[in-house]
Amino acid sequence: ALPIFKNNFNVEVLIPSEYKILKDTSTLFWATYNPDKEEVIKQLLVFSFIPKSANLQQEVLQKTDSILAQYLKGAKQEQYVKIESEFPPYYNNNIYKGIWKLEKGFMGGPLLAKTYFVGDKIIVSVGLVFDPNSRKRKHLKILEAIL
């Protein structure tokens, strides 16, 4: 595991070595776990923004939805990942727990997001799990530790 985020986001997070880093810029960090022999996909995304709204929780969810739709696409062009609006995420102590779904598709699973306040920015770290054949608790506990 390597500390990755200290330079770009001023938050130190350890990424397990089995994750593949897909993007590491000053605006977005994205890593994925997608082994060949398992039907498991885990995504980690970290981004930041300067809040402009009085409703901070809503703004965090909107920004997260926007990032998910931009980077996590399905097999078809019109498919993208979004936060499931039928079950709004539960929020407590800067942690959001909810469900994601593939728009115009048949995938979904748990979503976990943590927010950190650094100066005038909010840093959002998001983890998603897709594992249709098992319970997700173990995956979520690992994501919670990473984020």
Residue map of PLM features:
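Charge-rich, low-complexity N-terminal segments
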Residues: 1-3, 35-36
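Surface-exposed amphipathic alpha-helical segments
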Residues: 1, 13, 19, 123-147
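Secretory pathway targeting signatures of secreted, lumenal, and periplasmic proteins
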Residues: 16-69
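N-terminal helix-cap/turn-to-beta initiation motif at the start of protein domains
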Residues: 6-16
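Signature of long, low-cysteine stretches enriched in small and polar/charged residues
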Residues: 69-122, 134
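Secondary-structure transition/turn motif
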Residues: 33-37, 101-102, 128-129
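Short, surface-exposed beta-strand/loop "edge" segments at domain boundaries and coil↔beta transitions
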Residues: 38-41, 53-54, 104-108, 132-138
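Short hydrophobic/aromatic-rich beta-strand segments that constitute the beta-sheet cores
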Residues: 21, 31, 98, 124-125
